[in-house]
């Protein structure tokens, strides 16, 4: 089941959970989508600012598997 997150802090909390398996980063021309897979839900965060997206990518937990799509 997908869920959308609007706050960056909420996304980072979800990414640091124990059941978070992987993060997919999908880059589009107008936005960047971060999708974190947890045991029950797939949480999605949409960011339109490219600089914020790069900062968020750097602040992801190191043990998490990160996959970039496009």
From Swiss-Prot:
Record key words, sorted: Ribonucleoprotein, Ribosomal protein
Family matches, as InterPro entries: Ribosomal_eL38, Ribosomal_eL38_sf
Annotated GO MF terms: structural constituent of ribosome
Gene Ontology CC terms, in alphabetical order: cytosolic large ribosomal subunit
GO biological process, one term: translation
Pfam families for this protein: Ribosomal_L38e
Family assignment from sequence similarity: Belongs to the eukaryotic ribosomal protein eL38 family.
The protein, known as: Large ribosomal subunit protein eL38
Organism in which the protein naturally occurs: Julodis onopordi (Jewel beetle)
Phylogenetic lineage: Eukaryota, Metazoa, Ecdysozoa, Arthropoda, Hexapoda
Gene: RpL38
